[in-house]
Amino acid sequence: MNIPMRDPVIPGTSMAYHPFLPHRAPDFAMSAVLGHQPPFFPALALPPNGAAALSLPGALAKPIMDQLVGAAETAIPFSSLGQQAAAHLRPLKTLEPEEEVEDDPKVHLEAKELWEQFHKRGTEMVITKSGRRMFPPFKVRCTGLDKKAKYILLMDIVAADDCRYKFHNSRWMVAGKADPEMPKRMYIHPDSPATGEQWMSKVVTFHKLKLTNNISDKHGFTILNSMHKYQPRFHIVRANDILKLPYSTFRTYVFPETEFIAVTAYQNDKITQLKIDNNPFAKGFRDTGNGRREKRKQLTLQSMRVYDERQKKENPTSDESSNEQTAFKCFAQSSCPAVPAVGTSSFKDLCPGEVDRDXDSXDDXXLEXSEWGKISTTTXTHPWXQPAXGRQRVTTXGTKGAAVPKATSSPXTR
């Protein structure tokens, strides 16, 4: 049974959301909410001096709206933000009065049982320089929204504590104090804003959110530190316009079972197996666990054996030639398979082994293709094939017309 979880960020609180009090907020920039988010709101980013003025100590440990109220209470002078930031300030009185809306949002985590399985073993999420999607993906279902009101749905990932971890003796343990925080970003669902009726009619999924350890990332990915524990948070904002975010009602929901440790490669074999068993893109690692290349090689050898047997039945007089050339072709194809893997771009979002080498995978495919090209062009003129072709010409009394069909019927020249 899915039930909404309360936010454990504030000890002792019994509320699952944190409403914003608009009458306490004077004018301030939208960047107080979103921080550094050039991929999502390039025009709303503050200059360096403005960003520094709005940074609050310990802000990441507070709910979103506590950060907003804290920024408002600092009473930052309008002129200190510079001309660029001042251009994006909107007085509260210029906003349209919000219509009376009655709602009682409740959020249910999808695939709760799967998340709990991972949580019991210590969930790990791989982070890479090029960005990696989460598995299980973060999906929720919302109820209790006003059907006509518009909402913006957001997600962010914050540090769960101030510790660094290591995997030792088959368990996670504290290894020291946490590294300095990475720049924080909020991921706004691409369908925002939408009416409550639209949100409630479907599962809200954040499967496109990507995790990275590249501090210079410019794609809007969530930047995390490896070997640190993190907690995803989900936010519901009632607003018809993104520019009204600072003055809108925020509700924050936290599901403890979605907590995870960021890693560059999976540490716990049990987590690796869970991901293989439940991720639809992990078919190549099931059963034997040998990976795609080994499976391709086995399929190639099996198909060549069938082909060889069929050729023996059709051409009994050229058994010797077929055996020699087929043996070489089997060896060439098994060592250099040329069949590309299906679904490689999607599959690399999961597995820690060969797919973690994002740049190497493309090079490997090109290398396989080039090597196979060389082998296939030399097979027809390989020294093993030449004596057999010579013997065939002798048995046909030297007639050119008979020698050509014999050569073209061998597996090496097809």
From Swiss-Prot:
GO biological process, any: positive regulation of DNA-templated transcription
Coarse class of the protein's main subcellular location: nucleus
Keyword Transcription regulation: yes
Top-level taxon: Eukaryota
GO CC entries: chromatin; nucleus
Region entry Disordered, spans: 359-414
Residue ranges flagged as DNA-binding region: 114-287
Location of the protein in the cell: Nucleus
Keywords tagged on the record: Developmental protein, DNA-binding, Nucleus, Repressor, Transcription, Transcription regulation
GO MF annotation terms: DNA-binding transcription factor activity, RNA polymerase II-specific; RNA polymerase II cis-regulatory region sequence-specific DNA binding; sequence-specific DNA binding
Main function: Transcriptional repressor involved in developmental processes. Binds to the palindromic T site 5'-TTCACACCTAGGTGTGAA-3' DNA sequence, or a half-site, which are present in the regulatory region of several genes. Probably plays a role in limb pattern formation.
Record-given protein name: T-box transcription factor TBX3
Taxonomic source organism: Gallus gallus (Chicken)
